């Protein structure tokens, strides 16, 4: 069947109006003449060509000669290069229809928006081939000339970008040039022309088949071989676009529409002037709208269209094709061995070969072949030097055929051999087998590994042994007799930093599950702490109680709280050897002593913190890193888990030794009155738990007791004292003398007895309270600055102005009035 592919019998008459003379141009003769003259006179090396304006008189003379049918340009010299270049732009601009027809304009703009450069080149190549014969010939002539300018762009200073900016408005423009539309698509038009100039060698490959021929033989349907799932290389005609239907269309006898369904693959035979297509499907030809289909690449049809590569000598291997969905995950492969062992217990891997595409999506201008090719997935045995691969040895399954990824497998005495490249997707045990079978003639010797009888599983190295978990009964069934813990087994592995790390990590994970094993030394010592501890001779760490697990909360029941806290009385003593035993194996260490745990209710929680005379509080914190070697190891108390369930608690802290001096005493005698601290609210953070309570102070050695309680802010007692070792306070604000008012302070209430109970609240006499309310005094409970002489006078200030100015509160009372 012979059919005209392009309507070449109808040649458009391009009308050019020059000096009111209508000139009929049947062929792009004048464009060809101008391009040949410019090429012959060295225009490709002229700087600023097509950018510098030419002589107006010369340009008008050339236009007049063309209008009269005179095409002799021999009288012009190289001095007229810019004039000839200006005439070329003028002729292209004044054509009634550009060489890229208006119907093709939206398609070119749409293709330019593609992100894949290889697909963009393929579509541009096919669209230019679909242009009318006259326009296609003119495109090849013009862009073949412009491509030479890009070669000599160092001399003419005209890059492909500059040339595209000059010629895009003349050759690729819409029919109705609206301002918004032109501004939006101007850059896309420039991009299309720039691509055509740069990739002209690739696009001009079409010219070999169709430029000089007006009719070609078209096959209605591409022959499809069901056995090989491929089409022959000779049967693929590259002169056609392939489209995929996105909207179904029914047949119509009047319009001769092509019937198709959504998703059908349609071969586009011709692009009409109105922008619609003439397509073919299943031997039926008809019209279809360009909005009903999407132009696709041949590489997207890999399932139905796969080209067969040139024949390659292959080895005789079995053709057992198995299909398994691929799994995606990352794994590591061994660099010393090219074979990977898989067992039946491990998940099977899918051997997926990356596509090697020499088709439209991977074309380059340097390719001489005009037919896109798609290479099938080749076997690494067929071309071992072309495709790096990792072959597999798969142990036989219980079934006749192994359920392995899709690939070609060959059964040998050692298992099934896969001849396809593989992308590893699961971590694999790379253990080397002990026995190796002799090489055979039908497979490579480096892959012949015997099947192992033992199951190789992917797991971590064995962790050090640990004492068995201690079962703690509920609080309702607590035994009366002590329970002895089993002696801990010695560690079988040397105490290397790596083993210590695994041991430490494993115990950290298990400590949140079972709180009975939190006394293990690995929970407290860091991975490198054995170096430091072993360097100190006769050093020991005493652990008292059990660290509270982070999984317990304040909302747990009372039974679980008492059961978890019943392990707090257990004591562990780990004695470490001297520095000489650092590198000795742990199996030579004596077994750890047996510890006795008595499950009795714990005493009320009490935190005792030692405070020195320099008012610095020493806080001990259990950390995973050892202290610096210069400091001795402190006794680390392990707090009870029951702290996480308490709402309030009384914490006893002995205060520093403070000498209280009465200011009004001239003999500088010790005033028996003590410092009274008031805390309206406070909270103590311990082990990610909030504890609140009432703070009281113990009696210092040789002193009197100090008590505190929750007091009303308006009934706070006052005090006058000097406290040493306090930071200096900024001087008070200088207030004018006329605004100062002085009023004596009431004496603070005396304690009922210096030997009162520790938790007894301070009772203010009723008469003293009434007196304070009558005087409307607000007592500030603030320590005075050090080295301040307050003898004689008390300054009264305004609390409002003091707060606004952010001044430190005075060490005396004041009246708001």
Swiss-Prot record:
Annotated Gene Ontology cellular component terms: cytoplasm
InterPro entries, A to Z: Rho-GAP (IPR050729), Rho_GTPase_activation_prot (IPR008936), RhoGAP_dom (IPR000198), SH3-like_dom_sf (IPR036028), SH3_domain (IPR001452)
Amino acid composition bias (Pro residues), ranges on this chain: 461-471, 625-635, 725-734, 807-817
Where located?
Answer: Cytoplasm
| Gene Ontology molecular function terms on file | GTPase activator activity
Domain Rho-GAP, residue spans: 20-204
Residue stretches of biased makeup (Low complexity): 318-339, 359-391, 472-498, 534-568, 577-587, 607-624, 735-744, 752-771
Question: Site positions for Arginine finger, renumbered to this chain?
Answer: 51
Name residues in a coiled coil.
none
**Polar residues composition bias: which ranges?**
340-358, 396-438, 509-532, 705-722, 785-803
Q: List the disulfide bonds.
A: none
From the UniProt record, give one GO term of the biological process aspect: signal transduction
Q: Which Pfam families match?
A: RhoGAP (PF00620)
What is the name of the protein in this document?
Rho GTPase-activating protein gacII
Organism, scientific name: Dictyostelium discoideum
Q: Which gene encodes it?
A: gacII
